[in-house]
A protein has these predicted regions:
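Surface-exposed binding/hinge segments that line
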Residues: 145-229
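Surface-exposed patches in mature extracellular/periplasmic domains of secreted proteins
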Residues: 33-34, 140-145
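Intrinsically disordered, low-complexity Ser/Thr/Pro-rich tracts
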Residues: 1-26, 33, 39
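N-terminal short leaders/motifs
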Residues: 41-63, 107-120, 199-219
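Ser/Thr- (and often Asn-) enriched beta-sheet segments in non-cytosolic proteins
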Residues: 2-8, 58, 104-108, 155-157, ...
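Solvent-exposed, acidic/flexible segments
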Residues: 11-18, 30, 67-72, 85-89, ...
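N-terminal lobe/hinge region of extracytoplasmic solute-binding protein
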Residues: 23-26, 31-101, 131
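Aromatic- and charge-enriched surface segment that lines or borders ligand/interaction sites
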Residues: 95-140, 159, 165-167, 175
Length: 229
């Protein structure tokens, strides 16, 4: 079983931010950085020295098929691979633990996480993605790998605002590794992650918006499914 290990790094007492964000804070259009972060933010270990804002980022590409290369620096997943390429470390989830037979995995989310518009990021965003998007065959006829187990399919259950369980019909000790690769960075596949911003995306579903077809037509789409995707 691949273990999700805690990263032993010192929690900063103060935080820095990009100059453009600092200007927005000074202008009063953005809260201070400390108020935008969760109570236990993820802190990555430093390799060499702490970087500086600005400059040029150069990436090495493996060839024409390496189109997702540029997105790897911005990917976000439930857990992520450590620098050794083997161990898994926390990310969106501060912990991800299985039961004794690997059929149930419990994800503890970081308290106080927010979406880019400042709205809370909670277990409700997982439930929206699972119930209204992934289990909607019009939007997701082929289910994402992180929820599959052979011919069966797992389910997502909210325990509380910061706790989610992934329940499978059998042993699934590879779930953590698969979850570490489930992100939407490459080509915007928003159904390949366990969450979605429910507060924003609900407006594009007929379940929550009776005028969604008119919204799709106004945007030049054939129907609401194209608008959503």
């Amino acid at each position: 079983v691949v273990k999700v290990v805690e990263v032993e790094v010192e929690k900063p007492q103060t935080y820095s931010e990009a100059p453009g964000l600092a200007q927005a804070v000074s202008a009063g259009s953005l809260p201070p950085v400390g108020e935008r972060l969760p109570s236990d933010p993820m802190v990555m270990p430093v390799f060499g020295s702490i970087g500086k804002y600005g400059g040029t980022l150069r990436r090495g590409y493996l060839g024409p098929q390496d189109g997702c290369n540029m997105f790897r620096v911005s990917r976000t997943s439930l857990v992520r691979f450590a620098a050794d390429g083997f161990n898994l470390i926390p990310s969106v989830a501060k912990s991800l633990t299985p039961n004794s037979d690997g059929s149930v995995w419990t994800a503890k989310l970081r308290k106080g996480m927010k979406w880019s518009d400042g709205s809370p990021f909670t277990a409700d965003d997982f439930m929206f993605q699972y119930e209204d998007v992934i289990m909607n065959d019009e939007l997701t006829p082929s289910k994402p790998p992180f929820l599959k187990l052979g011919d069966g399919l797992g389910e997502v259950v909210k325990i509380d605002e910061t706790t989610v369980e992934f329940r499978f019909p059998g042993q699934n000790f590879l779930f953590a590794e698969i979850a570490a690769q489930a992100d939407e960075a490459c080509y915007g596949n928003t159904r390949n992650v366990p969450w979605a911003p429910a507060h924003y995306m609900k407006q594009f579903l007929p379940k929550y918006n009776s005028d969604v077809d008119a919204l799709a037509e106004a945007g030049g789409f054939e129907d609401w499914t194209q608008l959503y995707l």
